[in-house]
Design a protein with these regions (language model features):
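Surface-exposed interaction regions enriched in Ser/Thr/Asp/Glu
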Residues: 1-67
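C-terminal extracytoplasmic interaction modules
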Residues: 47-220
Length: 220
C-alpha cells in the first residue's frame, strides 16, 4: 500500500539533502524489479573543505553536535591535514548505519582513519597523531606530593601477537580482511579481530593494523 498526494508547488531545492534525478528506459529483457534497483557511489562534500577529507569530516560532525568555532582547535587539525593526511592520501569514507552511534564514537573513527585519536585540549575539541612526541616539560620534586612511581608490564601470552583487520573494499564493496604479522612470528597464537571504519584501501588497512600490532609488542 502507498499514500499519494498532489503537491501545490514544485520545490527547487531541498536544504541539507542531496537529490538525484534519473531517466531510465526499460524493456522486456529486464527483470520485473531491475529498473528500480540503482546503486550510487556518492562523494561526501563539505562546505569550505576538501571532499572526503579527514579534517572536513571532523568539522562537519563537530558543527552538527553544536560546537562553536571558539571550541574547535582549527590550528592543530588543519596542521595534521596539511602535514600528514593530505600528503599521505588519507581520507575518511564512512556513513552511519543507524542513529545509535554516538558523536564521540564517530569522532574516534574519523581519527582512527588518520592514524590518530580524538581528544580535548585546553577545552578545545582537537586531534592528535600517534608517533614520537617531543617532551613538553619536566617533573621536579617541588611539584610532587609523594615519591614518583613508574610501572612496567612485560610481554605475556595474553598479549596479541597478530592482528586481522576487516575493512570494506572500495572496488568490490565487500568486507575483506588483511592479516598483519611479524616476520619472526608468521603463525601467532592470539590474533585480534579489528574492524576498521572509513578506510577502503587494503594498503592503508595494513599499515594501520601493523601500527596496532607494533603497539602490542613495544608500547609498554
Amino acid at each position: 500500500q502507498a499514500m499519494r498526494a498532489k503537491l501545490s508547488a514544485r520545490k527547487t531545492s531541498y536544504p541539507n539533502v542531496t537529490t538525484i534525478a534519473l531517466t531510465i528506459r526499460t524493456g522486456n529483457r529486464l527483470a520485473a524489479q531491475s529498473d528500480r534497483r540503482v546503486n550510487l557511489v556518492a562523494t561526501r562534500l563539505y562546505d569550505g573543505h576538501a571532499s572526503r577529507s579527514i579534517s572536513g569530516a571532523f568539522y562537519h560532525v563537530l558543527k552538527d553536535l553544536g560546537y562553536a568555532d571558539n571550541q574547535i582547535d582549527f590550528a592543530t587539525i588543519n596542521a595534521l591535514e596539511a602535514n600528514y593526511w593530505t600528503p599521505r592520501g588519507e581520507t575518511f569514507d564512512w556513513s552511519a548505519g543507524s542513529d545509535n552511534t554516538s558523536g564521540l564514537e564517530v569522532l574516534q573513527r574519523i581519527a582512527n582513519a588518520g592514524m590518530g585519536y580524538f581528544l580535548l585540549s585546553d577545552g578545545l575539541a582537537s586531534a592528535g597523531r600517534e608517533g614520537v612526541k617531543n617532551w613538553s616539560g619536566v617533573i621536579s620534586p617541588q611539584e610532587q606530593t609523594e615519591e614518583l612511581q613508574t610501572a612496567f608490564k612485560a610481554l605475556s601470552q595474553d598479549d596479541y601477537d597478530g592482528v586481522d583487520v576487516t575493512y570494506i573494499n572500495a572496488t568490490t564493496w565487500a568486507e575483506e580482511t588483511v592479516q598483519c604479522r611479524f616476520s619472526d612470528n608468521p603463525t601467532p597464537q592470539k590474533v585480534e579481530d579489528y574492524t576498521l571504519d572509513g578506510v577502503k584501501d587494503p594498503d592503508r588497512a595494513y599499515r594501520i593494523g601493523m601500527r596496532r600490532l607494533m603497539k602490542y609488542r613495544y608500547q609498554r
